[in-house]
Design a protein with these regions (language model features):
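Canonical AAA+ ATPase core
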Residues: 1-66, 108-110
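Solvent-exposed, flexible loop/coil residues
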Residues: 8-10, 15-17, 37, 95, ...
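C-terminal engagement/docking regions of AAA+ P-loop ATPases
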Residues: 112-174
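Signal for well-folded cores of large energy- and translation-related assemblies
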Residues: 1, 27-30, 34, 38, ...
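Short amphipathic alpha-helical patches
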Residues: 18, 46, 61-64, 101-109, ...
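Conserved AAA+ ATPase small/helical "lid" subdomain
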Residues: 56-119, 123
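Generic alpha-helical secondary structure signal
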Residues: 35, 52-57, 72-76, 122, ...
Length: 174
């Protein structure tokens, strides 16, 4: 108590601080935390945002804007697709909120590079595979049948089939 040790170095630390750390449970660091450490920590488990509206607030607050508007209905649609992937039975490592932020930023970058002031449905479509494929991991039963790129593309085609208004309206009025 009152000391921190790293390797052979020990440092006296007053006990008037709060330590906050993060860890993804599916990937441990170089060493798992010992029982001694675990006994000194409170652990809070956090899942994905419970609603699309909450996730949208996080994405807009944390994402870069490039002064390019992202229509609200279009962002909702993109987040609906991410949430669909999170619930997919063949995905072992689910797309995180960072993936949602990545879609937001990449879609805006696509519009910006095309010299437009607003994101279109095509900007979102063009962003999905490059943003999502490397952020998810398919279960062994699925990853030997198709690549993550093909999987995301196929799931998006299925999603579009179930939401025909997306392409018909260019993402408007979903």
């Amino acid at each position: 108590e009152g000391k921190a040790t790293l390797g052979s170095y020990s440092v006296d630390l007053p006990a008037n601080f709060i330590f906050i750390g993060t860890m993804n449970p599916e990937t441990s660091a170089t060493e798992k935390l010992s029982d001694v450490f675990l006994d000194r920590f409170d652990i809070i488990h956090m899942g994905y945002p419970e609603t699309i509206e909450l996730e949208k607030q996080i994405v807009v607050a944390k994402g870069q804007t490039l002064q390019v508007a992202f229509p609200d209905d279009l962002l909702t649609f993109a987040l609906m697709f991410v949430r669909l992937l999170r619930d997919h039975k063949d995905i072992q490592k689910k797309p995180s909120v960072r993936a949602s932020i990545g879609i937001y930023e990449r879609s805006q970058a696509n519009a910006f590079l095309s010299k437009r002031k607003s994101v279109t449905a095509q900007d979102v479509t063009d962003a999905l595979i490059s943003v999502l494929a490397h952020r998810l991991e398919l279960k062994p039963s699925a990853k030997y049948l198709q690549s993550a790129d093909d999987f995301v593309g196929e799931q998006f085609k299925n999603f579009l089939r179930d939401h025909p208004d997306f392409e018909e309206n260019g993402g408007e009025g979903l």
